[in-house]
């Protein structure tokens, strides 16, 4: 599992925020290990969500929200990736991005498209906070810029 460099923002200490973080980690795991959605979901439900592992207490997460994100991203990835590719420069092409950053962008874009009931600001803030937990450089700014641009196109 990818290392989290920063501390959790207070916004991540809610069930949906915890589900988003877990979904990003699961998408990263699926990308790196090549595991399937149901296998990964079962592993997270059994071993990660709401568990104390090696002294680390995992946050109480909304499992249905987590499952919706990971299944949705995998199902819609062929539509999501070209949309993300259009937003990125040659220096930040999708294939060159860190796997965890790709997972963050895919999950955030999927949620913007498919969860119209969630305010844009909530989606953007949550995924920028997740990016800040993993990265100390320009990556959170990239997440903010890409999701902001996509939100303007998707939710006019």
From Swiss-Prot:
Q: Name one GO molecular function term.
A: RNA binding
Q: GO biological process: what's one of them? A: DNA-templated transcription termination
Question: What Pfam families does UniProt report for this protein, alphabetically?
Answer: NusB
Record's keyword annotation contains Metal-binding = no
Membrane-crossing ranges are none
Q: Does the keyword RNA-binding apply?
A: yes
InterPro entries from the xrefs?
NusB-like_sf, NusB_fam, NusB_RsmB_TIM44
Question: Mind telling me which GO cellular component terms the entry cites?
Answer: cytosol
Family assignment from sequence similarity: Belongs to the NusB family.
Tell me, what does this protein do in biology? Involved in transcription antitermination. Required for transcription of ribosomal RNA (rRNA) genes. Binds specifically to the boxA antiterminator sequence of the ribosomal RNA (rrn) operons.
Matches recorded under NCBIfam families:
nusB (TIGR01951)
The identity of this protein, by name, is Transcription antitermination protein NusB
Biological source species? Bartonella quintana (strain Toulouse) (Rochalimaea quintana)
* Gene symbol of the encoding locus: nusB
């Amino acid at each position: 599992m990818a290392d989290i460099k920063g501390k959790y923002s207070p916004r991540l200490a809610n069930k949906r925020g915890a589900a988003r973080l877990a979904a990003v980690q699961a998408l990263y795991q699926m990308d790196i290990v090549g595991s399937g959605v149901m296998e990964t979901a079962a592993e997270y439900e059994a071993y990660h969500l709401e568990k104390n592992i090696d002294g680390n207490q995992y946050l109480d997460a909304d499992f249905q929200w987590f499952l919706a994100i990971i299944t949705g991203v995998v199902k819609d990835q062929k539509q999501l990736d070209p949309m993300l590719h259009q937003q990125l420069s040659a220096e930040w092409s999708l294939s060159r991005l860190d796997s965890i950053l790709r997972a963050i962008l895919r999950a955030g874009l999927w949620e913007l498209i498919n969860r119209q009931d969630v305010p844009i600001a909530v989606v953007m803030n949550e995924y920028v906070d997740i990016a800040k937990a993993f990265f100390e450089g320009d990556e959170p700014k990239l997440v903010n810029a890409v999701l902001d641009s996509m939100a303007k196109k998707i939710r006019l």
